[in-house]
Structures are given as C-alpha cells and as structure tokens.
C-alpha cells in the first residue's frame, strides 16, 4: 500500500513552524508496512489544497492530510475537500456532544465556531478527537479516485498523533494482509559510516524482503531492521536471523533493541542494581542532570546535580584544589577527577559523573582545541574508575549533546560490566 502525506499551513512554508507531523506519521506508517512515496507541504489556499490532494490521490491509495480543520478563517481544508469530492456536510452528533461536555466542564457554552468543529463531510467515517475539538475524517473518495482513501486530521501534533493511534492505524492495518516485523537497534558514540563498514557482508546477504535503514542522529546512529511478507512464521524467522547476524557483529555497541533512550536504559539499570548517581557539570551546563530527570521516577536514583561553570564555583562547591586548577587548567582530566570526587563526597551518591570542556565556538587553543571534553566517573569506595579526554566536532549545541552522551555511554558500559560480573 502506498501513501502520501500532505501538511497544510502557510506557517510551514514560511518556516515559522517545523513540520514534525509528517515525520511522526511516516514513522507510524512504516511500522505497519505502508510505504510513503511523497511528503508535501501546502498553503492554506483552497485551490492549492484541492490541486495537491487531487495529484496525491492519482498516485497513492491513501492520502493523509493534517492541518486546516480549525475554527479560524485560514482553516480551509474541509471546504477544499468538499469541493474536490463534490459533497456536502453534516453535523456529527457524537462529536458535538463531546464538545458540549468539554465546554460544560470549563463553564462555557458552545460557540458557532466550535460547533463547526463537529461538522464533517458527507460520507465520512468520523475519527474521534480525544485530545481536542476538531473531528477527523476518513473518506472513501469514489470516482475518479475509486478505492482511494483520504484521511483528514487536525494539525495540532498531540491531536493528530492520538487520532493516528486510535483510528487511522487500526483502519489501515485492516486493509493489509501483509505481515511486517521491525526491530530498532539503538547505538550511540559510533557514526553511521563506521557501523555500515561493519555490516557490508550482512547487507549483501540479506533477503530481498528485509531492509536495513540507517537513522543517524547527533550522538550516533539507530538501525531499523524491517522484514515483510505474507506468512507470519516465515517473516519472523527471517527477520530474527538478520537481527541475530547484526547483533553478532555490532551487539556490544547496541544499548537497546526497543524504542528507548540511553538515559532510560541507565535508569532501569540503576533501579535493578539499587544504585544512585549525581553529576557535576561545567561544559554541559546541566544537560546531564536534565537528561536524567526527564525520566519519570528518576528521583529514586538521581541524587543531585552541580553546575559549576567558573573556577571559583569548582573550588567552592566541589572542593577542587586551587593548585589543580592553576597547574592544569579547568579543562583537564585532573580537574574532571576532582569534580567527580567532590560530587561523590557532597552528594553521598554511589556514582558521580563529571564534565569539563570547550563547547565553542570560542575558547580553543592548540593544546586544547574546540570540542575538547574531559570527563570522569567516580564510585563510592572505589575512587575514580573512568577518566578520559576526547575531542568532538559540531556546533556548540551539538557538542553539548555529544559531550553528555559520551559520559552516559561510558556510564552505561560501566553498569553493564557490573551487571555481567554479578551474574
């Protein structure tokens, strides 16, 4: 099954908003074996919407449109599709009742503009909007687009994503008899080119129905293994064979085979081992602490964080010796060790992670170029167990992400070794 995604909105074409909806939809479609052939951004002009949707329906069996279903004058998608299909509109009573209940809970009445949110194109299968007011619509288009489907959803990301999960994906799955298996392999600290070089022979030998996608990101690359066919048993067996071969080659670099962040995996490991952690940060400016505390329940294992940007703060808050700072400079392995030990002592945690470096774009020297990172990990009762100096490329923002990821990856490896030694 082939699909196209159309995102409606002048704000997308002006660069005022990033089109995140299309990426989310494409990922969800890929997971059920639906191929996306085009992703298009379209203006709010009715003629443009009609022309764009007409062209898409001529190429794809399913066209998903987001945006233009709201209550304002620039929300023209519904009227444009009415014109394209030659249909009228009706009030969807169930959607209207939900709007009434939502407004009553706020002590407000339903305005004419809000009522319009429950008006749908004739012949629509209504997609419930569990997060907002604008009803979604699933349309069997009829001639000249017989057996082609048009799906209309709001442009608000949280509303669109809920509709995809609750209405669109179940519908599209029912149209397909094919079986698809997907396994993500999550990797940080190693780039796409290096991983690809390790997997050349495996890719050359892969069955035609199995694909390997490389999804590079700031801190590394994720792999997605996808297999498709008509027999579940055969597809699953073929898929697992390829995954096993890849894991045999690069498995030590893979921190997870499910959709989960590195910090979430570390959190799970800390919970299993009943350990706690604290961080002392200079160049990462609190990003490490933020990544830990982005996870619900992190208070169980995350003790505290220190952001010590100046030399005085490193001395005052963590007890880094003045002599060490003078002799080696703030960006040095010696200072990273002092920060980790001070953090361990002040926090009482089982582990302390420390970062100091030069994120740029200024501050580099021949001896300590831009992108230099010094980091250390200290363990209660064991002192400093990891201390490294590396140089990383990128913008200031990219380096901060890569710096924090480098430390987290090192911490993950340390925890993994400890788990293995206790088995």
From Swiss-Prot:
Gene3D superfamilies: 3.30.70.2860, CinA-like (3.90.950.20), MoaB/Mog-like domain (3.40.980.10). It comes from the Bacteria. InterPro entries: CinA, CinA-like_C, CinA_C, CinA_KH, Competence-induced_CinA, MoaB/Mog-like_dom_sf, MoaB/Mog_dom. Belongs to the CinA family. This is CinA-like protein. It comes from Chlorobium chlorochromatii (strain CaD3).
